[in-house]
Amino acid sequence: MVYKISVIAVCIAALAIVLMVKAYTGPDEPPMALDEHTYATITPLEFDKCCAMWLILRFVDAHAVFKVYPQGTYLAGPRVFDVGGATWSRQHRKCTSDCIWDDLNVNDGAAERIVLMAHQIELNRWHLDQFPQAQQADNELRQIIEQNPDPNDCIKLTMEYFDTLYAQLRTVSRGAQNRSVMGA
């Protein structure tokens, strides 16, 4: 009896190991190939993911095209973002936008403030009331996402949203610089 139980336990352990290895290494089919300017991610769309798209389009690849696949789709490769295992994905105390921004090494105060908003929204969701500008931006973007279920339409509108937000933040930054130069 003890022998049978031992054999069953060993078989169950072996099966568990096989399943864990399978889950860790991904499915049998290879990841889908992406065209040169195509970047891929999975649903759902949210502030950090849309901010990451905007950063890619404005600072990495002006010809970027985004493909959004259903959650659970196996994606891998150099132009995959905000999915497990991707270089540009949430890691410890960094959101996806933080990871992209760190790689860019760009000095742009307005863009950096947008990335900071993404960070606050992604990592401080339960304390967002402490960051009113980020909270407002999150609410505005959520409204765009909810009203536009088609990912392509939604991406177009969110890129316009981030361009507008960027222009507003640049104007505020320039105004502050002008006041400091004038001694105000």
Model-derived segments and spans:
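A recognition module on extended beta-rich or small alphabeta surfaces enriched in W/G with H and D/E
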Residues: 78-115
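A charged, amphipathic interaction segment
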Residues: 103-184
